[in-house]
């Protein structure tokens, strides 16, 4: 198979770009440059070559897993002698702030909804399960946003549990990056799709991340296939600062933006502010809560300097 060999004991098979790209086989690329543009995050560039090299082999692998999952469900139904409700295949996608989780999730959604057959693929972000801004302020958690304690984890677990129970018209709260808050009385409604992609910082976390709120089940208990998007922290920090600078001249300039006051910063002040936010919040959360969950993933995508994925690690 051309796998990289290593003396280190690991539960993962490791592929470089060229080795992974060969696993695409005959999967067709149906996306065009025009299709790709709206899938990219504000500060991210990604080519069709990256889609072909990395995401098409991944889509092929996931489709194999989905086929096996359907067979397993058929066996279970036959054994139990009952017809269970339709339940979606759940894919979780985790990683740090600024690593490009949202772009990866949207590309996967676009590929899986049209190959090998047309099917319904819903994308839900766990941002919607953050506590509303007023509650975070009341609990003095504003500077802990994104940390485990800032999420209504019981509501999130109830959501994924309902998905796996075959419930219909399940509501997921919607988060606004403009107002930095949950949008009141607005929801995404999930109604028995074939696949759900659940994207967020916390989808691989376990009980060790919620010591003050013990419970017996976690989001990962309901996930069929988990992905972690990885990169060196120095790269993540530089990407975050770069994104902050671009937002300063765009989204932050909107008077309705929660971060409107940052639009008035000079470039030097903006770099200093973004660096402080990273060091005191995002970087700390990365080290304490996000990186420790990485090894629980079924597949790890490792990015290099240009945001391109250089290495793929697949659980054996």
UniProtKB/Swiss-Prot annotation:
Q: Which residues form a coiled coil?
A: none
Q: In which pathway does it act?
A: Cofactor biosynthesis; coenzyme A biosynthesis; CoA from (R)-pantothenate: step 1/5
* KW Hydrolase (keyword) present: no
Using the chain's own numbering, where are the disulfide bonds?
none
- EC number of the protein: 2.7.1.33
Sorted alphabetically, the keyword list is: ATP-binding, Coenzyme A biosynthesis, Cytoplasm, Kinase, Nucleotide-binding, Transferase
First-level EC class: transferase
Q: Which chemical reaction does it catalyze?
A: (R)-pantothenate + ATP = (R)-4'-phosphopantothenate + ADP + H(+)
Cite a single GO MF annotation: pantothenate kinase activity
Q: Where along this sequence does the record place binding of ATP?
A: 95-102
Q: Give the InterPro entries listed for this entry.
A: P-loop_NTPase, PanK, PRK/URK
Q: Would you kindly state one Gene Ontology biological process term found in this protein's UniProt entry?
A: coenzyme A biosynthetic process
Tell me where on the tree of life, at the top rank, the source sits: Bacteria
GO cellular component terms listed in the entry, alphabetical order: cytoplasm
Q: Where in the cell is it found?
A: Cytoplasm
Output the Gene3D superfamilies linked to this UniProt entry.
P-loop containing nucleotide triphosphate hydrolases (3.40.50.300)
Q: Which HAMAP family match?
A: Pantothen_kinase_1
The entry's family comment says: Belongs to the prokaryotic pantothenate kinase family.
The name under which this protein is listed is: Pantothenate kinase
**Species this protein is from:** Haemophilus ducreyi (strain 35000HP / ATCC 700724)
What gene does the UniProt entry assign to this protein? coaA
